[in-house]
Amino acid sequence: MKAILGIKKGMTRVFENDRAIPVTLVDVAGCKIANIRNGKVELVLGSKKKGTKAQLGQYKEIGYVPMHRWLVKGEIPEGLKLGSDMVAETFNKGDVVAICGISKGKGFAGVVKRHGFKGGPRTHGQSDRLRAPGSIGAGSSPGRVFKGTRMGGRMGSDTVTIKNKRVVDIKENYILISGPIPGSNGDLVKIYIQE
């Protein structure tokens, strides 16, 4: 099992063979192994101020109620036990990983931004149809708008998984991953080796 929870900290660059490579820093300090359930390992990160007695009993190995939890298929890595910290060295330089996070929220967006619609003509007497969606259906038959018709609406804040990202370097509690990853700085990300 090669998986870890981390917090996105921002982007920078590193140099390899006189080439600048953009990287994202992910802070993995504080990720612990909390439980084993049905052949899955529960990784946790962060802590809540309060928890119920049931939750405190469930997480007595780590001594607090976690903020973020993630169940991962697999066995506990060798040399680690319940309550142990997962360290950045779980991964190796050059590993190809997948990263799962929640994309930045954009709020209510129109069809041009959200779906890439071309919009209407800019000239020839057109005054206010430039970024409009246009027709959304036929006439009295079918007499309704089909489900899934692309329209304006809330954009972003979706769970996004990006694959084939390379671990460029590992420094202390930070994993440096090539290129951008989903989410804002300070957001939770899940990093794992692709199966």
Where are these regions (language model features)?
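Extended basic (Lys/Arg/His-rich) segments that typically form rRNA-contacting surfaces
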Residues: 1-195
